[in-house]
Amino acid sequence: MPRHSRGKSSSSASGASQRQLRVGELIRHAMADILAQGGVHDDTLAGHIITVPEVRMSPDLKLATVYVMPLGGHDTEAVLAALAHNKKFLRGEVAHRVNLKFAPELRFRVDERFDEAERIEKLLRTPAVQRDLNSDSDDNA
């Protein structure tokens, strides 16, 4: 009879734990508020509307990877550089807003899911794929 381990949950192998997800969501809300309210005094960040679609936490909650996307997708490199330049300030602001034992180190990445979804949509609209989809529906009828 197999023994069940009580230490780590099996969800850690397949994805983030419930706590990682909860803390990531708290930090995402805090970062979105800070950026929306213009809390960072930086010309590059002030000139862009930045969305924060996701924050992924490390298992020890000491590292937060913040996925960002400037509205319109323009100047992503400049926005990432400005966020990296101001990450100490942002870390302090997050620490004030989210009650954690340690303020996590922030790493910023561009969220490329929107670009990937657009690429797939374009691919699905190509004539060759449309022809295949239509022939499959004709075969099933």
Swiss-Prot record:
User: What is its subcellular localisation?
Assistant: Cytoplasm
Q: Which GO terms describe its biological process?
A: maturation of SSU-rRNA
Its name, as the record gives it, is Ribosome-binding factor A
Please name the SUPFAM superfamilies in this protein's record: Ribosome-binding factor A, RbfA (SSF89919)
- Please state which protein family the record places this protein in: Belongs to the RbfA family.
Q: Which HAMAP family match?
A: RbfA
The answer to whether keyword Cytoplasm applies is yes
- List the Pfam families: RBFA
GO CC, sorted alphabetically, is: cytosol
What NCBIfam families does the entry give? PRK00521.2-5 (NF001802), rbfA (TIGR00082)
- Principal location: cytoplasm
Quaternary structure, per UniProt, is: Monomer. Binds 30S ribosomal subunits, but not 50S ribosomal subunits or 70S ribosomes.
UniProt keyword Cytoplasm, yes or no: yes
Organism, by scientific name, is Afipia carboxidovorans (strain ATCC 49405 / DSM 1227 / KCTC 32145 / OM5)
Query: A single Gene Ontology molecular function, please?
Result: ribosomal small subunit binding
Looking up InterPro entries in the UniProt record yields: KH_dom-like_a/b, RbfA, RbfA_dom_sf, Ribosome-bd_factorA_CS
Q: Which keywords does this chain's UniProt record carry?
A: Cytoplasm, Ribosome biogenesis
What's its job?
A: One of several proteins that assist in the late maturation steps of the functional core of the 30S ribosomal subunit. Associates with free 30S ribosomal subunits (but not with 30S subunits that are part of 70S ribosomes or polysomes). Required for efficient processing of 16S rRNA. May interact with the 5'-terminal helix region of 16S rRNA.
